[in-house]
């Protein structure tokens, strides 16, 4: 007779809590997000920017066909991490809810309303049998009266952030945000900070591996940076990183000189 671990029942059943109060399947969904491509968002007073890692696994893939920032409405976009097929289902649902709201009320859906609806759907998939949690987290960003940036968790929880990252590079990117983000950051600074945080999580950052989009309060319409614009920002950032590394090495040598 095969040995069955004590936690096996809680491990397989989505609706059953373990004795220490956990839903194992929700934890596993979070693990899928932690292994996913990194996505970051940065907010400034006049708008918000999203930047996402594009994992091009073959040189035969057309990079332009690999979309990682999804437009929900004119004023709202989402960047996923985790199981992208799950994320597409959430994106399609968000687009539907945005259309229903616009047809019903004759105005764009507030981002907070849309985030709550998506998180209600996520939460329902942790409570009923016959389904599993969505193995995807979304960064949802947009503007109504002000710029907003939310992280949605597989459990259905959501949080508003000034700057945030999800995916495998979360810890590295969040450390950079903690060090460099300020409330008076401008659009140029926010875009550069988002690309910097993403570049630090990549072994070989390139314009093909980074997708960037932003929205401003003035225009209230998402715009994606083309490859040339991403390359310009990335080259500036990589130059700054090299200069910092040179300065650090010079400091190390000056400390050695003092010991002689």
Swiss-Prot record:
GO biological process: proteasomal protein catabolic process; ubiquitin-dependent protein catabolic process
Chief place where the protein resides: cytoplasm
SUPFAM superfamilies, A to Z: N-terminal nucleophile aminohydrolases (Ntn hydrolases)
PROSITE patterns, A to Z: PROTEASOME_ALPHA_1, PROTEASOME_ALPHA_2
Family matches, as Gene3D superfamilies: Glutamine Phosphoribosylpyrophosphate, subunit 1, domain 1 (3.60.20.10)
Keyword Cytoplasm among record annotations: yes
UniProt-annotated location(s): Cytoplasm
Any one Gene Ontology cellular component term annotated for this protein: cytoplasm
Keywords for the protein's UniProt record, in alphabetical order: Cytoplasm, Proteasome
Parts of the chain that traverse the membrane: none
Pfam families linked: Proteasome, Proteasome_A_N
Description of activity control: The formation of the proteasomal ATPase PAN-20S proteasome complex, via the docking of the C-termini of PAN into the intersubunit pockets in the alpha-rings, triggers opening of the gate for substrate entry. Interconversion between the open-gate and close-gate conformations leads to a dynamic regulation of the 20S proteasome proteolysis activity.
GO molecular-function terms, A-Z: threonine-type endopeptidase activity
Record-linked InterPro entries: Ntn_hydrolases_N (IPR029055), Proteasome_alpha (IPR050115), Proteasome_alpha-type (IPR023332), Proteasome_asu_arc (IPR019982), Proteasome_asu_N (IPR000426), Proteasome_sua/b (IPR001353)
Family designation: Belongs to the peptidase T1A family.
Role, per record: Component of the proteasome core, a large protease complex with broad specificity involved in protein degradation.
UniProt xrefs under NCBIfam families: arc_protsome_A, PRK03996.1
Quaternary structure, from the entry: The 20S proteasome core is composed of 14 alpha and 14 beta subunits that assemble into four stacked heptameric rings, resulting in a barrel-shaped structure. The two inner rings, each composed of seven catalytic beta subunits, are sandwiched by two outer rings, each composed of seven alpha subunits. The catalytic chamber with the active sites is on the inside of the barrel. Has a gated structure, the ends of the cylinder being occluded by the N-termini of the alpha-subunits. Is capped at one or both ends by the proteasome regulatory ATPase, PAN.
PANTHER family per UniProt: PROTEASOME SUBUNIT ALPHA/BETA
Protein name per Swiss-Prot or TrEMBL: Proteasome subunit alpha
The organism of origin for this protein: Thermococcus gammatolerans (strain DSM 15229 / JCM 11827 / EJ3)
């Amino acid at each position: 007779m095969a040995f069955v671990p004590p936690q096996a029942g809680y491990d397989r059943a989505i609706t059953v809590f373990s004795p220490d109060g956990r839903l194992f399947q929700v934890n596993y969904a979070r693990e899928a997000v932690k292994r996913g491509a990194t996505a970051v968002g940065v907010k400034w007073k006049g708008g918000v920017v999203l930047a996402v890692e594009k994992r091009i696994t073959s040189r035969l893939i057309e990079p332009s066909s690999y979309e990682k920032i999804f437009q929900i409405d004119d004023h709202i976009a989402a960047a996923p991490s985790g199981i992208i097929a799950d994320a597409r289902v959430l994106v399609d649902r968000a687009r539907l809810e945005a259309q229903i709201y616009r047809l019903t009320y004759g105005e764009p859906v507030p981002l907070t309303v849309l985030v709550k609806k998506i998180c209600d759907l996520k939460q329902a998939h942790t409570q009923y049998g016959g389904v599993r949690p969505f193995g995807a987290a979304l960064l949802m960003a947009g503007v109504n009266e002000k710029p907003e940036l939310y992280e949605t968790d597989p459990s259905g929880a959501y949080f508003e952030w000034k700057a945030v990252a999800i995916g495998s590079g979360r810890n590295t990117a969040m450390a950079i945000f903690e060090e460099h983000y300020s409330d008076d950051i401008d659009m140029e600074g926010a875009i550069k900070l988002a690309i910097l945080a993403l570049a630090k999580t990549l072994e070989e950052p390139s314009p093909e591996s980074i997708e960037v989009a932003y929205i401003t309060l003035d225009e209230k319409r998402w715009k994606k940076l083309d490859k040339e614009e991403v390359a310009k920002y990335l080259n500036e950032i990589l130059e700054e990183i090299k200069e910092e590394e040179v300065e650090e090495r010079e400091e190390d040598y000056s400390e050695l000189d003092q010991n002689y």
